[in-house]
């Protein structure tokens, strides 16, 4: 009951309204003050609030109904639960505040008294969904809760970081290295007839620091934070000004390793544990949170159910391509009756010091978890199979749903997510959540539970079992479309339009190094000057990650007249793990849509270029927490114009993960291009600024009104499918080993970070 109150009452965070259009503009003082509050209220959110201004403000909580635009039964129940102490310690939710002052006071109160996890969850929903918060942002979730993204070894080192102790340690370490590294290669040479230095490449690639002679501890960063666009920032005088006097420290951080048991899946941990990938899934489930009803928050206008299920398919396709890179092939089939050969230990630790549960090798799905949830989930899938097979469903209220209409996939998507828009809550509500609770071995009556990665959106994608289970979820989508007729040749044909050629530039992936701001893990004393917080120390997690070089498409399209069109681009495999060509009928499930854009064709031959950095659903690295806070403070002093588009929208997929790893000699893949008339009844992104906002609930955040994944949404009849306005292009994806220079000879500056790594 307690959890039900919490989940339903969190809806009170946000007020329903449409999203109005905002020009990209410079923030005014009022906006900056709000942004400063949001940044400070989540600083070290697991520690007591240290900002005196917000402590004073948070001493009271507004329970007066007149202070809210909406006050329902769940808010009443929450208030009663709060009075009797029947809520999670330190945090549940805050209400529909009529104005910023009431909201701010309630947020400060919640920050001091309520559970920090629920507090951040609720605050995130408010910032995303309230129209009066347009442009306001929170730090990325991996900056608020770094312990959900980095292993326990790193977290412990960050939590106990002390500058004074570090200063003494680094002095002793220098004396040690001056002796050890004088002739490192000679020291190891000919021992057991091996020259160990030349075997540094035997380390997993993502243990890059060993090749530079670094250890897993803190190093002073005297130059700059590492990221793709660091050269641009290094030339910005304002950027250099805000970091003057700031001490930065980095520590190498690994992905999960094979420690106690063999797990071949760990070779993919650089992908499954990628910070950007897990952040994307987290925000997708914040944008379309299952507890928010579509009518109130406009989510139905975005086709929330279909879009959520489409994203599941996209992620599965991307994961499958990464598996092919390593020769693994199909994602294993999931069944509650099966034994999963390879276990998983996330090596994560909760902020209270309790480690996350792990899954052993030969995990018997049926033998773990609460059996009441097991039967609920099994019943859920059986019921779904029944109604899809029948093609019609009569709800508890007597409403008839025709499941042979393609647009009914919206209902199926809502059922699979278990959101409150499910067309029959009596039978289907929260079954998806129950499955995760079964995997996490918890139930709604537990007051204390062990942390488990399946209980957090930001952690669940780390486990390979996630993809197995979600493949089962996606199978419902394909089962639904088994009963929908394939597109005919006439439906796919765009008369008068022919794709003559598409030239693709070289596709190259590589591993780069990046710094993540993890200052929220620090426990040292905060610095205040005249009551104002001074961010004088920053901790950085330095990690290797997959990236790709920019690439582009050169289109050559012939048109009989001027047409406004939508051009879709998909990436998919060519061969399976055994080198066999995958038929298009089977392969349609494996194609990932990487771009869609509107273009006006002129009569005749159209020759134009599309750059990978312009893909509409991808984003580059977001500006870090530290940087954003310093920019805000500089703007409040009148020394900087703070643009609302200073950071990337939270809802984008990481641009650097568009391409799979590939092979050194080239991995065969294929692009698919398809042109269709633009027929949408709206202008995409027309009611909001997509440079910094996501337009959740606007109804105009998608390119057009065609089904997601079109034309691969339905089964394919290869006799009907091929038309002149589509084009397949065979390509190869090459992987460049950026660590190759460390293999052949000794790194001259061994024991120090190599800043020439990027050159």
Swiss-Prot record:
Assembly, per entry: Heterohexamer.
Keyword Secreted in annotation: yes
Residues in the signal sequence: 1-16
Predominant localisation class: secreted
Gene3D superfamilies named in the record: Di-copper center containing domain from catechol oxidase, Hemocyanin, C-terminal domain, Hemocyanin, N-terminal domain
Keywords for this protein: Secreted, Signal, Storage protein
GO cellular component, one term: extracellular region
Tissue distribution: Fat body.
Function text: Arylphorin is a larval storage protein (LSP) which may serve as a storage protein used primarily as a source of aromatic amino acids for protein synthesis during metamorphosis. It is a constituent of the sclerotizing system of the cuticle, and serves as a carrier for ecdysteroid hormone.
GO MF annotation list: nutrient reservoir activity
Organism: Calliphora vicina (Blue blowfly)
Compartments where found: Secreted, Extracellular space
Protein name as catalogued: Arylphorin subunit A4
UniProt cross-references to InterPro entries, sorted A to Z: Di-copper_centre_dom_sf, Hemocyanin/hexamerin, Hemocyanin/hexamerin_mid_dom, Hemocyanin_C, Hemocyanin_C_sf, Hemocyanin_N, Hemocyanin_N_sf, Ig_E-set
Origin superkingdom: Eukaryota
Family, as annotated: Belongs to the hemocyanin family.
């Amino acid at each position: 009951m307690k959890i039900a109150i919490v989940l339903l009452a969190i809806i009170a965070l946000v007020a329903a309204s449409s999203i109005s259009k905002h020009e990209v503009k410079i923030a005014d003082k009022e906006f900056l003050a709000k942004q400063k509050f949001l940044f400070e209220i989540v600083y070290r959110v697991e520690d007591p609030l240290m900002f005196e201004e917000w402590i004073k403000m948070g001493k009271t909580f507004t329970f007066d109904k007149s202070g809210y635009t909406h006050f329902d039964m769940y808010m009443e129940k929450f208030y009663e639960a709060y009075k009797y102490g029947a809520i999670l310690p330190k945090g549940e939710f805050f209400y529909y505040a009529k104005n910023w002052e009431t909201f701010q006071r309630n947020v400060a109160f919640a920050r001091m008294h309520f559970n920090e996890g629920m507090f951040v969850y609720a605050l995130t929903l408010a910032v995303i969904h309230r129209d009066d918060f347009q442009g306001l942002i929170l730090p990325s979730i991996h900056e608020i809760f770094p312990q959900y993204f980095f292993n326990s070894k790193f977290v412990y080192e960050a939590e106990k970081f002390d500058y004074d102790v570090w200063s003494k340690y680094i002095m002793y370490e220098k004396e040690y290295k001056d002796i050890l590294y004088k002739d490192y290669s000679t020291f190891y040479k000919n021992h057991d007839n091996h020259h160990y230095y030349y075997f540094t490449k035997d380390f997993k690639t993502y243990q890059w620091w060993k090749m530079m002679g670094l250890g897993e501890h803190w190093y002073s960063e005297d130059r700059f934070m590492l990221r793709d666009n660091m050269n641009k920032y290094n030339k910005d005088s304002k950027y250099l000004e805000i970091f003057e006097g700031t001490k930065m420290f980095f520590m190498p951080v690994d992905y999960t390793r094979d420690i106690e048991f063999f797990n071949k899946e760990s070779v993919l941990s650089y992908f499954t544990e990628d910070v950007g990938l897990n952040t994307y899934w987290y925000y997708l489930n914040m944008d379309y949170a299952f507890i928010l009803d579509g009518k109130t928050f406009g989510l139905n206008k975005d086709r929330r159910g279909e879009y959520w299920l489409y994203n599941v398919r996209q992620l599965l396709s991307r994961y499958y391509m990464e598996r092919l890179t390593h020769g693994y092939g199909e994602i294993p089939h999931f069944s509650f009756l099966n034994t999963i050969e390879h276990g998983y230990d996330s090596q994560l630790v909760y902020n209270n010091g309790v480690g996350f549960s792990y899954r052993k090798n030969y995990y018997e799905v049926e033998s773990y978890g609460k059996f009441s949830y097991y039967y609920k989930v099994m019943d859920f899938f059986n019921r779904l199979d029944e109604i899809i097979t029948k093609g019609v469903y009569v709800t508890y209220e007597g409403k008839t749903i025709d499941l042979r209409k393609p647009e009914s996939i919206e209902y199926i998507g809502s059922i699979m997510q278990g959101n409150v828009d499910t067309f029959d809550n009596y039978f289907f509500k929260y079954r998806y959540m129950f499955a995760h609770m079964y995997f996490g071995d918890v139930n709604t009556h537990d007051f204390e539970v062990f942390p488990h990665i399946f209980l957090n959106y930001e952690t669940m994608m780390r486990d390979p079992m996630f993809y197995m289970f979600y493949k089962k979820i996606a199978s419902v989508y394909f089962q639904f479309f088994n009963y929908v007729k394939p597109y005919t040749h006439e439906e796919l044909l765009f008369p008068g339009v022919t794709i003559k050629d598409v030239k693709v530039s070289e596709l190259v992936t590589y591993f780069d190094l990046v710094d993540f701001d993890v200052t929220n893990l620090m426990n040292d004393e905060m610095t205040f000057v005249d009551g104002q917080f001074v961010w004088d120390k920053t901790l950085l997690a330095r990690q290797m990650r997959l990236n790709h070089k920019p690439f582009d498409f050169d289109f050559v399209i012939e048109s009989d007249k001027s047409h406004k069109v939508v051009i879709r681009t998909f990436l998919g495999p060519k061969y399976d793990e055994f080198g066999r060509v995958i038929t298009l009928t089977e392969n349609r499930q494996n194609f990932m849509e990487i771009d869609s854009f509107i273009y006006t064709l002129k009569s005749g031959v159209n020759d134009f270029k599309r750059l990978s950095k312009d893909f509409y659903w991808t984003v580059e690295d977001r500006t870090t927490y530290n940087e954003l806070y310093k920019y805000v403070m500089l703007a409040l002093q009148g020394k900087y114009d703070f643009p609302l588009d200073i950071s990337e929208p939270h809802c984008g997929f990481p641009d650097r993960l568009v391409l799979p790893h590939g092979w050194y000699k080239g991995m065969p893949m294929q692009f698919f291009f398809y042109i269709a008339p633009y027929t949408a009844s709206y202008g995409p992104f027309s009611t909001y600024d997509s440079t910094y906002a996501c337009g959740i609930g606007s109804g105009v955040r998608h390119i057009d009104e065609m089904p997601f994944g079109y034309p691969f949404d339905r089964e394919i009849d290869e006799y009907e499918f091929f038309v002149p306005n589509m084009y397949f292009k065979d390509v190869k994806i090459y992987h460049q080993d950026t660590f190759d220079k460390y293999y052949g000879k000794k790194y001259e500056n061994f024991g120090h970070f190599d800043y020439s790594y990027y050159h």
